[in-house]
């Protein structure tokens, strides 16, 4: 990393993000001697450096940790490994980019980096609802990832509730019936917006019951400050409030990809995720790559994010080799 006081820093690869995809990209790029610079952000999207995993307690589905590992600890280890191989980490949030010409410009409020290649790995934030008790029982029975947390012992053979009405809500509700005694779907409207086939699967499942025209107004715990014990559900038509004793509540109301800072410089899909070429991490701008949940709205797992971070680093390395070869021929 080059640069004098007040001058832009110069690097081969700049990585934007701090989750599994960003740090895996950094590890691979650093080992390839590309001397990556990584902007990890400062409470970017209101989440600490490390991404969504820092909001998770036990991670039990990441290979290599048979006893599980705390989400924050896993990301601390990823960060340490990035540093070990020579990644320069800047604890600032990227506010602007310029991908119109090489070198690409990536800037926070106080630091500018010029890079020959960029990896965008800023993730996506699960949408959360806020009501009485929603923050107090977050990660204590309330979650936004059924695949990540649904198999936890606290949910097994216990009633579970899901909020949502789209395909993800239907899919997660069916998934949770493998573990919970039964699942309540709570939806604000009297019809689902999910595809017909996904609706049919959920509505035909004997372990699923739907609360139409309803919303959760309160979450509460057991005696002695225990985890989630139930929720109060209000019918928006009648005003009646029902008390559901559940051990789990899952938000399935979508995710918000962190792409606003891009300023329209990369092609996005209809849901705001960075569009990548099939089978690669290449974006609409040559030399700019995307990895992790910022381009993945299907899997959204730590392990798949890490895998795509590896892909992005390898794609960036190959791109730089090609550019170098072309420039050599031009000389």
Curated annotation (Swiss-Prot):
Instruction: Provide the alphabetized UniProt keywords.
Output: Disulfide bond, Electron transport, FAD, Flavoprotein, NADP, Oxidoreductase, Redox-active center, Transport
* Catalytic reaction annotation: [thioredoxin]-dithiol + NADP(+) = [thioredoxin]-disulfide + NADPH + H(+)
- List S-S links within the chain: 145-148
Disulfide bond is among the record's keywords? yes
Query: Which EC numbers characterise this protein's activity in its record?
Result: 1.8.1.9
What is the required cofactor set for this protein? Answer: FAD
Highest taxon of source: Eukaryota
Q: Which GO terms describe its molecular function?
A: thioredoxin-disulfide reductase (NADPH) activity
Residues recorded as binding FAD, renumbered to this chain, are 18-21, 39-40, 47-52, 61, 94, 148, 293, 300-302
Q: Which residues form the signal peptide?
A: none
Listed GO CC annotations: cytoplasm
Record's miscellaneous remark: The active site is a redox-active disulfide bond.
Homology family: Belongs to the class-II pyridine nucleotide-disulfide oxidoreductase family.
Any idea what job this protein has? Possesses thioredoxin-disulfide reductase activity.
Q: How does it assemble?
A: Homodimer.
Instruction: Please give the name of this protein.
Output: Thioredoxin reductase NTRB
Q: Which organism is it from?
A: Oryza sativa subsp. japonica
């Amino acid at each position: 990393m080059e640069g004098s006081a007040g001058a832009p820093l110069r690097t081969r690869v700049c990585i934007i993000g701090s989750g599994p995809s960003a740090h895996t990209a950094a590890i691979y790029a650093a080992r390839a001697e590309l001397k990556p610079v990584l902007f990890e952000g400062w409470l970017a999207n209101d989440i600490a450096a490390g991404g969504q995993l820092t909001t998770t307690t036990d991670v039990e589905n990441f290979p290599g940790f048979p006893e599980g590992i705390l989400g924050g600890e896993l990301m601390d280890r990823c960060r340490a490994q990035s540093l070990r191989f020579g990644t320069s980490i800047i604890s600032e949030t990227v506010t602007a980019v310029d991908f119109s010409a090489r070198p690409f410009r990536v800037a926070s409020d106080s630091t500018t980096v010029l890079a020959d290649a960029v990896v965008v790995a800023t993730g996506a934030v699960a949408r959360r609802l806020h009501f009485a008790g929603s923050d107090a029982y977050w990660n204590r029975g309330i979650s936004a990832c059924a695949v990540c947390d649904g198999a936890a012992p606290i949910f097994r053979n216990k009633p579970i509730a899901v909020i949502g009405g789209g395909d993800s809500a239907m899919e997660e509700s069916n998934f949770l019936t493998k573990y919970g005694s039964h699942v309540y779907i709570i939806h604000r409207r009297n019809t689902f917006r999910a595809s017909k086939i996904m609706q049919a699967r959920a509505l035909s499942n004997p372990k699923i019951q739907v609360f139409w025209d309803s919303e959760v107004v309160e979450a509460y715990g057991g005696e002695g400050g225990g985890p989630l014990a139930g929720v109060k559900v209000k019918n928006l038509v009648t005003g009646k409030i029902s008390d559901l004793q559940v051990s789990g509540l899952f938000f399935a109301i979508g995710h918000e990809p962190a792409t606003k800072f891009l300023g329209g410089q990369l092609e996005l899909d209809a849901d705001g995720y960075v569009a990548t070429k099939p089978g690669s991490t290449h974006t609409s701008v040559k030399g700019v790559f995307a990895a992790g949940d910022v381009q993945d709205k299907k899997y959204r797992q730590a392990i798949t994010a890490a895998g795509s971070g590896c892909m992005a680093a390898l794609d960036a390395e190959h791109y730089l080799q090609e550019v170098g070869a072309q420039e050599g021929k031009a000389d």
